[in-house]
Amino acid sequence: MFEIKKICCIGAGYVGGPTCSVIAHMRPEIRVTVVDVNESRINAWNSPTLPIYEPGLKEVVESCRGKNLFFSTNIDDAIKEADLVFISVNTPTKTYGMGKGRAADLKYIEACARRIVQNSNGYKIVTEKSTVPVRAAESIRRIFDANTKPNLNLQVLSNPEFLAEGTAIKDLKNPDRVLIGGDETPEGQRAVQALCAVYEHWVPREKILTTNTWSSELSKLAANAFLAQRISSINSISALCEATGADVEEVATAIGMDQRIGNKFLKASVGFGGSCFQKDVLNLVYLCEALNLPEVARYWQQVIDMNDYQRRRFASRIIDSLFNTVTDKKIAILGFAFKKDTGDTRESSSIYISKYLMDEGAHLHIYDPKVPREQIVVDLSHPGVSEDDQVSRLVTISKDPYEACDGAHAVVICTEWDMFKELDYERIHKKMLKPAFIFDGRRVLDGLHNELQTIGFQIETIGKKVSSKRIPYAPSGEIPKFSLQDPPNKKPKV
């Protein structure tokens, strides 16, 4: 059997960096080189301050960096030396042309394929790590076949990642499954078994699933679509709970105890974010439309529509509760990452909520423990989010949560950071304008509602009526509409 001794990973982002760091950590006899065209990112991987935050990542990197784990911008040499090349580059949603807003843009995948074939000789395994549409491996293989050389043998596999940001290291060390797809030919199966051997040193063999390439590619899209669907489903129930007096947490517990349903991903919130869910569901929608399956496409589109609705509904609730206007009012936004234990802001609900409130003239004071100021400014300065001077006029980045809440009309919790449960809310209430509102978009304060009401807060949360003496207001009856799907037409201001 072919033995993999050297691995090259093209792409040092949220997938490539942690994945290959764990492989190097678990397989010290394999030399792992992570390469990227972004020199500043590679410099960060080689520094004490890593470019991404992930619990446990720093310890893993430091245990093997400089020994059998290397980060470099020398892409060509790393490809030439490798037995296995992971393609772990971005596959963003297209922002222009056919499939705009839904189809995956595979330009980086294609560029990798061309660079790999240019720098390869002999036998090499090329593996998709990036989330790609079905039959992307076929496109890679066609590029290889069109640029073949004597004695060149490139085998293409699919090995999608199933890690979740915030628990990536745990997921990589103890995965639910490892999925490897390859050609159903002797050469293809030889490559599959070689990659299986890499994982078998720490992953039980029964957790390593082998399929054909197309099943592997579709399984990744389907997995993310099912998870997103669960969140949209419970969020739809949260709207019903708010209208009837039910508590969505109690409903979720009741249905989650049914073993046929299970209790995971039944946490109602202001909406899902991150780099994968929306992108992959929209990719699935586009695939269904391209295959003339309009009913299937509409079914999955509703998952995205419900997520957008949940965000608009939450923003409308903030505005309505504050006497139908937030113009010139200070609003504290606690949390900007799309979930706790990560600094990733891609498709974060905080961006959308901030957009709605800025459009109404609110002054936002934003705090997040792991998202840099520059990233928040870039996200909110996107042409699809704000006008040229909106961010400079309406947004302040605070150094701590108390500064953000000082003098605020309302506190809006958008990320479920554990630290928000431990804040001194009496101190916060004293410094806020009265009536003081808390809008808990992540249900992180569920156990504190009585205490917070005793302090004097008006509490609004997802999927539950809390405040017994709610301040009367005149509802606008209007839920704002907004999309980040429009293509950028200018560079964001920092």
Curated annotation (Swiss-Prot):
UDP-alpha-D-xylose (UDX) acts as a feedback inhibitor. It binds at the same site as the substrate, but functions as allosteric inhibitor by triggering a conformation change that disrupts the active hexameric ring structure and gives rise to an inactive, horseshoe-shaped hexamer. The active site is at residues 161, 220, 276. The gene is UGDH. InterPro entries: 6-PGluconate_DH-like_C_sf, NAD(P)-bd_dom_sf, UDP-Glc/GDP-Man, UDP-Glc/GDP-Man_DH_C, UDP-Glc/GDP-Man_DH_C_sf, UDP-Glc/GDP-Man_DH_dimer, UDP-Glc/GDP-Man_DH_N, UDPglc_DH_euk. The modification N6-acetyllysine is found at residue 107. The lineage of its organism: Eukaryota, Metazoa, Chordata, Craniata, Vertebrata. The protein goes through several conformation states during the reaction cycle, giving rise to hysteresis. In the initial state, the ligand-free protein is in an inactive conformation (E*). Substrate binding triggers a change to the active conformation (E). UDP-xylose binding triggers the transition to a distinct, inhibited conformation. The presence of an intrinsically disordered C-terminus promotes a more dynamic protein structure and favors a conformation with high affinity for UPD-xylose. The allosteric switch region moves by about 5 Angstroms when UDP-xylose is bound, and occupies part of the UDP-glucose binding site. At the same time it promotes domain movements that disrupt the active hexameric ring structure and lead to the formation of a horseshoe-shaped, inactive hexamer. It comes from Pongo abelii (Sumatran orangutan). The modification Phosphoserine is found at residue 476. GO terms for biological process: chondroitin sulfate proteoglycan biosynthetic process; gastrulation with mouth forming second; heparan sulfate proteoglycan biosynthetic process; neuron development; protein hexamerization; UDP-glucuronate biosynthetic process. Residues 321-325 are annotated as: Important for formation of active hexamer structure. This is UDP-glucose 6-dehydrogenase.
